[in-house]
Amino acid sequence: DDVHPEVAYIAQLAAKVVGLDIAGIDMVARDISKPLHTQGGAIVEVNAGPGLLMHLKPAVGAPRPVGQAIAEHLFPSDADDEGPAGRIPLVGVAGTRNTATISRVVAWLLHLSGHHTGLACRDGLFLDRRLVEATDCAHWEAAHRLLMNKMVQAAVIESDARTILRDGLAYDRCQVGVVTDMDGVETLAEFDVHEQDQMTKVMRTQVDVVLAEGAAVLNAAIPQVADLAPLSDGDVVLYAQDGTLPVIAEHRAKDNGRAVFVKNGRVVLATGSAEHVLGT
């Protein structure tokens, strides 16, 4: 409370000049409530790894919540519209039917939008157009490596029922969650999954993590997948080759629901009764 505004500004400037987001600034001064130049004061050290104990449990004065301040500075909340929520755009793709192809197409579209995009799928681990690892990377370890990479600005991660049961998802929430199918129950006996109905509890994981401002993209041609729609915290987009499916018609009629389907050989995005041909 006693720090002079000019002293605080000089400390911030010193950290910026060195290129640090968080720094400890050691100063020599007779009175911290006065500008340094009026008392011959100076900065003697810029510390990249400052200790917090002296602020949390000071010998003199009130404790300061520096840990909370650091976290809020590095990962600002979007609740007050002052910055991003500390998340990158993330698309999760779950299933077995052409999921690698879907993941690669989505990653390519994100790349074209200007994001440095990471992709973990059955075809390998990719950073933008570069193949980093040419093995099956549709698993937790590869996805975690991707999310730890500071250069990645958007990510697409493929999963299936086996990886979800074995490891879970590598992320807590996603902007878009795609579920293509619920195949493969015959391979999951080791996880005590024997019946097709049990697949709902497994594959709903991908829908459960969709953010409120995000969307679940579900295959309307498979009733068990389409039935996951009420579980999404965000919007729901249904897709199928046949746009006349009853589930799509019902979804479009309810709250202007969105759906993607093929009509007269063209891909159509429908919002309620309105239809827009994509690619035109």
Region locations from a protein language model:
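Flexible beta-alpha connector loops of hexameric P-loop NTPases
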Residues: 129-136, 188-194
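Hydrophobic anchor at the start of a short beta-strand
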Residues: 116-118, 154, 216, 236
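Residue-level signal for inorganic ion chemistry
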Residues: 26, 120, 158, 217
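Protein kinase-like catalytic core scaffold
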Residues: 42-44, 155, 178, 216
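ATP-dependent carboxylate activation and anion-phosphoryl transfer catalytic cores
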Residues: 1-92
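Acidic, Mg2+-coordinating active-site environments of NTP-dependent enzymes
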Residues: 87, 166-172, 176-280
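Conserved nucleotide-sensing/catalytic segment adjacent to the nucleotide-binding pocket
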Residues: 130-167, 179
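Walker A (P-loop) phosphate-binding motif
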Residues: 78-131
